[in-house]
């Protein structure tokens, strides 16, 4: 598995968790969107919309 593919898988897994947090009302959409952008940046991925 290449490093890029590994990072994409990790990012998509974190995106799933963020979407669950949004669905369950754990945090505001604004905070979760910021977290999503930062996760994408740190993994070198293009952010996917919530």
Where are these regions (language model features)?
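Acidic, Ser/Pro/Thr-rich low-complexity regulatory regions
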Residues: 1-50
